[in-house]
Amino acid sequence: KEVVHIHAQDKVGTAQAGKMDMDEYNGLISNSWGICGACTSMTTANSMCMVAEALGMTLPGNSSMSAVSSQIRLLSYQAGKQIMNLVKENITARKIMTVDAIKNAIKLDMAVAASSNLILHIPAIAHEAGYDLPWWKYFDEASNEIPLLSHLAPGGPNSIKEFDLAGGMRAMLKELLPRLNGDCLTVTGHTLRENVEDAENYNHDVIRSLDNPVMTEPGIGVLYGNLAPEGAIIKIAAVPHGLWRFKGNARVFDSLHDGLDALRAGQIHPGDAIILRYMGLKGRFGTTAFTFQEELKGLPELYNSCAIITDGRFSGGTSGLSVGYTSPEAALGGPLALVK
């Protein structure tokens, strides 16, 4: 099994709790961090690279290539030449990043269980392009249409390197093409369909087809309920199956630091529903609960039995029963502010 950086991050809590030899932990760190470039798992950086390709804004195959490969060196040269062609043909970003292209990116998000933070970044891109539409609605619709086609770390067993060797984003987009708008223009000057028509899938265990998905549920889900009348986001592909149904007592913290203090003091118990609130965009600039989630993951008796619910966000590499972006956030009087 390939060791990637997320495996070292998952052991932070274990090491801090004294349940792992520090020499062993340092060895794991030394051998799990890859070369320069984006992370080796499905975190926000890789997610945004894949979104850029699904939008049509990169040359085909760019998003999963190694940062120091001969492939990327050749592609960078080709990109420079293609920019000049785009200028000559008057093909601009606004002609490429259409509403349909953005919807393609959202569907790709579901198929690869990309970062939950795309709920921020994709609407921000759309806003800059002049499309102020109900993007949460489109995420919700896509979550009911697109199954998980690739189970990448942290939720699954495969790395980005394995994804690339299987055929990368071109193979993924070809498998997903029946659910996409293949007529969208891309920076090649050709359509998305034309870009992937000759793509090969070299490993059908890593990149699945629509007829044989990893699971019929999407990688990312939009949740609604009495705590989130306007929605919340969860990375379904990274939730242990034993936690797909959950009931627990609320443990409420009004800041990340209070929650971490309680966790480190042994005051969090198996089965708790941990509420981390006032961490949203208006309350505290969209604070990430990733540190809490990672330390919790190092304590299996808690990670495998507890839920985290926050109006803040997580790292793209989050896993476990972790619900973020709960809306309206507590600072705006959302229901999360009433939990005791």
Residue ranges and their predicted role:
Residues K1-E329, G334-K340:
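Catalytic or ion-coupling anion/metal-binding cores of large enzyme and transporter domains
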